[in-house]
């Protein structure tokens, strides 16, 4: 563990560690946060989505027209072993900034930005007064209608919400009926959704904050249909909408967490068979350098994808057909596009 942590730091807390079954070496919660020697096996890169290409100012990314992304901290309540921004915790150049005034001005000048994502790091790791300061500045920009806050603290440390009534009050103040705050939660396994987490989510809901959930498919954590079914159902039961299911990005140290893309798709499809419509609203996407690419279907010979979101607006909605590649783990592994695909006709009479 120490050898791995020297390269990829470890961070957690007593609450989250208490969720681990220490007698089980394959415990999924353990895999999420405890260093694994396989992280040193090589492969992957520090910036798999080429975020540097969309960085307009230190701490500000503008990849999609409508969305501005603020890196407000490089601290998390725990460090996920599969984090796609491991570079923030390594000996790399600092990307998050404390002074966001220039970034706020950029957002003010770009009226196409209708929503801003506060992330990092974990946005709720900021001091409550600092959170309020940023929210206040963003709410003074007329064209910013949605503020999103990326956070795994509902899983890592729900007491951050329950033990700080001022935080809940601040969020309530700036999440209005016309302009909501969305909390982008990160429950990866159903056991993370404890009674305490549900109470914290309820406090946010009562404050007018809309909570949604996103998770990657993680080998050995949630890479089976039964686990995903339970996760999708339980978050929806708690009033948390499934939002995205991500293909695990090819970040440095992440290789053993990845499942093949087509296997991920099949796991999700199987998991949905026992879910209501409300529990299966998530889209399965790859957060590629060029945009969010959704896998929408497959046959024995082909896979079907579309750009759900794209850095180049002309690509939004673009439909793509590729020859099946059962070992592909990322979009770049699909090299055989089918330009003349014609659906097979089936006569019903």
Task: List where the protein language model places each region.
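Flexible, acidic/Gly-rich N-terminal and inter-domain linker regions that tether
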Residues: 1-63
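Radical SAM enzyme core and accessory elements
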Residues: 1-12, 305-349
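N-terminal pre-triad scaffold of radical SAM enzymes
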Residues: 9-12, 56-84
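Conserved, mostly hydrophobic/aromatic
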Residues: 16, 80, 243
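Iron-sulfur (Fe-S) cluster-binding segments and ferredoxin-like electron-carrier domains
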Residues: 83-95
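Conserved AdoMet/S-adenosylmethionine-binding subsite of the radical SAM
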Residues: 101-109, 115, 124-275
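Short flanking/linker segments adjacent to small metal-binding domains or redox-active Cys/His motifs
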Residues: 129-137, 293-314, 321
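A C-terminal junction/extension of Radical SAM enzymes
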Residues: 263-305
């Amino acid at each position: 563990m120490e050898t791995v942590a020297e390269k990829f730091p470890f961070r957690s807390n007593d609450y989250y560690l208490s969720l681990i079954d220490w007698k089980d070496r394959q415990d999924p919660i353990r895999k999420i946060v405890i260093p694994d020697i396989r992280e040193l096996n090589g492969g992957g890169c520090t910036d798999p989505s080429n975020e540097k290409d969309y960085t307009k100012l230190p701490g500000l990314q503008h990849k999609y027209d409508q969305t501005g992304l603020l890196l407000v901290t490089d601290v998390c309540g725990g460090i996920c072993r599969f984090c796609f921004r491991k570079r923030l915790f390594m000996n790399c150049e600092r990307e998050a900034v404390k002074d966001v005034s220039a970034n706020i001005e950029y957002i003010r000048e770009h009226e196409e930005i209708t929503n801003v994502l506060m992330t990092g790091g974990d946005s709720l790791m900021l001091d409550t007064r600092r959170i309020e300061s940023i929210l206040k500045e963003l709410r003074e920009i007329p064209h910013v209608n949605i503020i999103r806050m990326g956070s795994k603290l509902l899983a890592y440390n729900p007491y951050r919400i329950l033990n700080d009534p001022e935080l809940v009050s601040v969020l309530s103040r700036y999440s209005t009926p016309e302009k909501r705050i969305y909390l982008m939660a990160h429950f990866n396994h159903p056991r993370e959704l404890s009674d305490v987490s549900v109470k914290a989510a309820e406090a946010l809901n009562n404050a007018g904050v809309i909570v949604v959930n996103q998770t990657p498919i993680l080998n050995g954590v949630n890479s089976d249909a039964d686990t995903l079914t339970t996760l999708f159902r339980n978050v929806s039961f708690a009033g948390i909408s499934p939002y995205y299911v991500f293909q695990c990005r090819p970040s440095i140290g992440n290789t053993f967490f990845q499942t093949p893309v087509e296997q991920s798709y099949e796991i999700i499809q199987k998991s949905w068979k026992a879910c209501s419509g409300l529990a299966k609203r998530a889209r399965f996407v790859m957060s590629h350098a060029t945009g969010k690419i959704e896998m929408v279907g497959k046959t024995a010979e082909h896979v079907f994808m579309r750009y759900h979101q794209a850095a180049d607006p002309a690509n939004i909605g673009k439909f793509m057909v590729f020859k099946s590649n059962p070992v592909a783990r990322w979009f770049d592994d699909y090299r055989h596009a089918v330009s003349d695909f014609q659906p097979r006709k089936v006569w019903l009479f």
